[in-house]
Structure formats: structure tokens, C-alpha cells
Amino acid sequence: MTPLMIRIRQEHRGIAEEVTQLFKDTQEFLSVTTAQRQAQAKEQAENLHQFHKDLEKDTEEFLTDTAKERMAKAKQQAEDLFQFHKEMAENTQEFLSETAKERMAQAQEQARQLREFHQNLEQTTNEFLADTAKERMAQAQEQKQQLHQFRQDLFASIFGTF
């Protein structure tokens, strides 16, 4: 064989060895990369699963806390409303009681004023009637006196003087 052939064979072997080595290196790289990616995917899946569990737990806690807060707030509002209703009823009762007392006092005052007015009217009427009776009595006495004088004068003029 000629040295050129030997050399071509050696180069061919060298290229084949390099291709084989390159193939091995590529396979090893792909194998390592695949293993890394699978490990990374597994880790991401675990992280995602843990995140999902944590999110569910946090959501459940949040909803529970929110429900407790709302229940406490509703109870407080119910208590406040009950207290307001109670105070309103007491205030209304006090108002009605005070109003009834005021109206009773006004009615008593009006009754007193009406009695006083009636008494004054009765007294004034009695005084008026008494004064009128006195005046009429005085007029009647005067008219009687005048009539008596007229009769005497008439008698004297008819029969003469005695």
C-alpha cells in the first residue's frame, strides 16, 4: 500500500474516531441535559404543587378569618341595633311619659284657669245683678216716691189741701 493510502486510512480512522468521540460527547451531553431538565421539571412540578397547596391553605385561612370577622361584625351590628332599639324604646317611653305629664299639667292648669274664670264670671255676674237690682230698687223707690208725690199732688189738686 502506498503511503498515501495508509495516510488516508489513518485520517479516515482519525475522523471516524473523532466522529465516534463527538457522537459519544453529544450523547453524553444530551443525556446529562435531559437528566438536568427532567430534574428541573420535577423540581418545578414539586414547587408548583407546594405553591398550590400553600395557596389553598392561605385561601382557606383567609376565607375562615374573613368569615370570622364578618360574623363578629354582624354580631356587633346586631348588638348595636338591639341596644339602639332598646334606647329608642326607653327614650320613646320617657318622651311619652313626659308628654303625658306635661299634658296633664296643662289640663290641670286649664281646669284651674277655667274654674277661676267661672268663679270670676259668677262673681262679676252676681255683682252686676246685685248692682242692677239695687239700681232698679232705687229707681223703683224713686218712682214709687214720685208716684206717691204725684198722687198726693193730684189728690190735693182735686180735693184741695188738708
Swiss-Prot record:
Gene Ontology CC, one term: gas vesicle
Subcellular location: Gas vesicle
InterPro entries, sorted: Gas-vesicle_GvpC, Gas_vesicle_C_repeat
GO BP of this protein: gas vesicle organization
Location of region: 4 X 33 AA tandem repeats: 19-150
Keyword set, alphabetical order: Gas vesicle, Repeat
Disulfide bonds, paired cysteine numbers: none
Residue spans of the Sequence repeats: 19-51, 52-84, 85-117, 118-150
Induction field: Gas vesicle formation in this filamentous organism is restricted to specialized filaments called hormogonia which differentiate at the tapering ends of trichomes. Transcribed during hormogonia differentiation in red light. Probably part of a gvpA1-gvpA2-gvpC operon. Transcription is maximal after 6 hours, degradation of the larger transcripts (with gvpC) occurs rapidly between 9 and 12 hours or upon a shift to green light. All transcripts disappear between 12 and 24 hours.
Major location category of this protein: other
Role this protein plays: Confers stability, involved in shaping gas vesicles, hollow, gas filled proteinaceous nanostructures. During planktonic growth they allow positioning of the organism at a favorable depth for light or nutrient acquisition.
Similarity-based family: Belongs to the gas vesicle GvpC family.
Protein name: Gas vesicle protein C
Organism the protein comes from: Microchaete diplosiphon
